[in-house]
Curated annotation (Swiss-Prot):
It catalyses: H2O(in) = H2O(out). GO terms for molecular function: water channel activity. The record marks C20 as: Involved in tetramerization or stability of the tetramer. It is found in: Cell inner membrane. It comes from Brucella suis biovar 1 (strain 1330). Belongs to the MIP/aquaporin (TC 1.A.8) family. This is Aquaporin Z.
Length: 228
């Protein structure tokens, strides 16, 4: 079990470091930097690369919503769910702390949102709580369908990380303006703890919505689409 939890810790670490790190350190440097497209691609690439690296050890979840969906779908034992969540959240917190230290090394540093998620005044585009709730539920549900479908016995072998990585990239392209894109409670928790905003007070949405979306996605796949 230790090797599985270690894989989830380091996999989540890499996801947050590559994804949130690109947003914090590179999105606006120099001037335009890598922008939304670059950040979206960074999140997708982190999942793709680490899924190939450690997916064979733990399943490559790196996300409490994914772990919940796999439990609902019967692919992850219920007894493993909470340990997976703990490893994922700790990995995200460790990464956020390191990113904070790195970012603070720049003159005139201000933590600001630190790539955290939010709605209302904390939404990049000023979107409401309801808009944030809906988009996070819908996109998480489809992310789960992509994951369950691409890793099923019906799909071509060996290509799942590519589909999942591109799926996460597309999700970010759609929703960065709305919530700064979560679909991952661990990712949201890590950076919220170090943000110099009210991100922590809005964190509930980025647990509730992805977990609800995960259950919906798993039910859709298991009940209507999948045969495995």
């Amino acid at each position: 079990m230790l090797n599985k939890l270690s894989a989830e810790f380091f996999g989540t670490f890499w996801l947050v470091f590559g994804g949130c790190g690109s947003a914090i350190l590179a999105a606006a440097f120099p001037e335009l930097g890598i922008g939304f497209l670059g950040v979206a691609l960074a999140f997708g690439l982190t999942v793709l690369t680490m899924a190939y690296a450690v997916g064979g050890i733990s399943g490559g979840h790196f996300n409490p919503a994914v772990s919940l969906s796999l439990t609902v779908a019967g692919r992850l034992p219920a007894k493993d769910l909470i340990p997976y969540w703990v490893a994922q959240v700790l990995g995200a917190i460790a990464t956020a702390a390191i990113l904070y230290v790195i970012a603070s090394g720049k003159d005139g540093f201000s933590a600001g949102g630190l790539a955290s998620n939010g709605y209302g005044e904390l939404s990049p585009g000023g979107y409401s709580m309801m808009a944030g709730l809906l988009i996070e539920i819908i996109l998480t549900a489809f992310f789960i369908i992509i994951i369950l479908g691409s890793t099923s016995s019906l799909a071509p072998a060996g290509f799942a990380p590519i589909a999942i990585g591109f799926g996460l990239t597309l999700i970010h392209l759609v929703s960065i303006p709305v919530t700064n894109t979560s679909v991952n409670p661990a990712r949201s928790t890590g950076v919220a703890l170090f943000a110099d905003t009210a991100a922590l007070s809005q964190l509930w949405l980025f647990w509730v919505a992805p977990l609800v979306g995960a259950v919906i996605g798993a039910i859709i796949w298991k009940g209507l689409l999948g045969r495995d």
